[in-house]
Design a protein with these regions (language model features):
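Transmembrane alpha-helices and adjacent helix-loop boundaries
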Residues: 1-238
């Protein structure tokens, strides 16, 4: 949901209102962060599986909003997005997009590490380990939970901006429930408590889905003469 908010808000600001891409890199994550802040209110008393269902439900709301505001978003038909422009240079090639994203991934990891080592990060970890113990230690649960949603929205919105402008086209199909499941798998594979683990988990899943699965799919299709699409889904699921 936050990824979609960042992507669409940046695309609309840059291409329809003439906002510079560099400024949208600041404004769009803030908008996504505010959406995270809003969803944090009903989620304050929810934990575990129900919290996950709540955030997924919010994703459906965002999708309906995108379709409803078709004057700006073009609804489910999708939206063409301009290439990113920084310092007067338009970034178009795949390699340039790669280095742009890589640069901001490094920045995100550094910022994430700084947050994790700060007072805010220690409060997050205390709440994760035990809400009762954290509250007994004087940590304001509501405050830090809301802050966690805001920061999550910031990071996801930032990623949405990069996704939109390096993909050149976005639609509601890009932000379905499967994408959320992919993100969860990436974090679980790498380790939910480690920033570097999340990065490694992402690399593993991306390589698995785009390199190893197609290779195995072709071999199994040749051996057993089954449908290639079914094989790819089966291999990735395993």
């Amino acid at each position: 949901a936050f990824l979609a908010v960042g992507a669409y808000s940046s695309a609309i600001m840059v291409d329809q209102f003439g906002v510079p891409f560099a400024l949208s890199l600041i404004l769009s994550p803030l908008i996504a962060g505010l959406f995270g802040f809003v969803i944090g209110f009903p989620a304050l008393r929810i934990t575990g599986m129900y919290l996950g269902l709540t955030t997924m439900g919010f994703g459906f709301i965002v999708k309906r909003m995108i379709i409803a505001f078709r004057e700006w978003t073009h609804g489910s038909g999708g939206l063409d997005v301009s290439s990113p422009m920084l310092f007067g240079y338009t970034i178009k090639s795949d390699w340039n997009n790669y280095f742009l994203i890589y640069t901001f991934v490094v920045i995100a990891v550094v910022v994430g590490r700084r947050i994790a080592k700060s007072k805010i990060g220690r409060a997050f970890m205390a709440i994760r380990d035990s809400e009762q113990a954290a509250e007994a230690a004087g940590i304001n649960l509501a405050k830090y939970k809301m802050l966690a949603f805001f920061i999550s929205g910031l990071f996801a919105g930032f990623a949405g901006v990069l996704f939109a402008h390096t993909s050149s086209f976005i639609s509601t199909d890009h932000f379905d429930i499967l994408l959320s499941i992919y993100f969860i798998i990436m974090v679980l594979v790498g380790g939910a408590s480690s920033i570097y683990g999340a990065v490694l988990g992402t690399l593993f899943i991306v390589l698995l889905d785009n390199l190893f699965v197609p290779l195995l799919k072709d071999q199994i299709h040749f051996w057993f003469n089954t449908q290639a699409g079914d094989i790819q889904s089966l291999i990735f699921g395993l």
